[in-house]
Amino acid sequence: MIQEQTMLDVADNSGARSVMCIKVLGGSHRRYAAIGDIIKVTVKEAIPRGKVKKGDVLKAVVVRTKKGVRRPDGSVIRFDGNACVILNNNTEQPIGTRIFGPVTRELRSEKFMKIISLAPEVL
């Protein structure tokens, strides 16, 4: 469960290291985002010569949460931290060309097949 002011790690090579959620998209009073939801983030820590810089406001998709995701068979997949992948503000496609760490099968929609194909492991 990601809400405003939540700090997330970045699971791609866009140049951002950590970001902060500033808005959960999809409804005027929506409070929480789960895996697969799009959020608005600001870059808090970035590496030199990256594609994004500190202070940039971008869209991101949540790929891992400590809360986890419940499957129809009753199992729950949880992670050690919260992570997201930075998206292009217009096309909503990933800015980075590599994804680090596992992602869940819940991202397997038309919009995020690129993330699934780049990920080293799909749980």
Curated annotation (Swiss-Prot):
Q: Which residues cross the membrane?
A: none
Q: Which cysteines link up through disulfide bonds?
A: none
Q: Name one GO biological process term.
A: translation
Annotated signal peptide: none
Question: Which InterPro entries does the record associate with it?
Answer: Ribosomal_uL14, Ribosomal_uL14_bac-type, Ribosomal_uL14_CS, Ribosomal_uL14_sf
Q: Which SUPFAM superfamilies match?
A: Ribosomal protein L14
Q: Which UniProt keywords apply?
A: Ribonucleoprotein, Ribosomal protein, RNA-binding, rRNA-binding
> Which PROSITE patterns does this entry report, sorted A to Z?
RIBOSOMAL_L14
Q: Which domain of life is it from?
A: Bacteria
From the Swiss-Prot or TrEMBL record, what is one GO molecular function term? Answer: large ribosomal subunit rRNA binding
Gene Ontology, cellular component aspect:
cytosolic large ribosomal subunit
Role? Binds to 23S rRNA. Forms part of two intersubunit bridges in the 70S ribosome.
Instruction: Give the record's subunit note.
Output: Part of the 50S ribosomal subunit. Forms a cluster with proteins L3 and L19. In the 70S ribosome, L14 and L19 interact and together make contacts with the 16S rRNA in bridges B5 and B8.
What family, per the record? Belongs to the universal ribosomal protein uL14 family.
Q: What is this protein called?
A: Large ribosomal subunit protein uL14
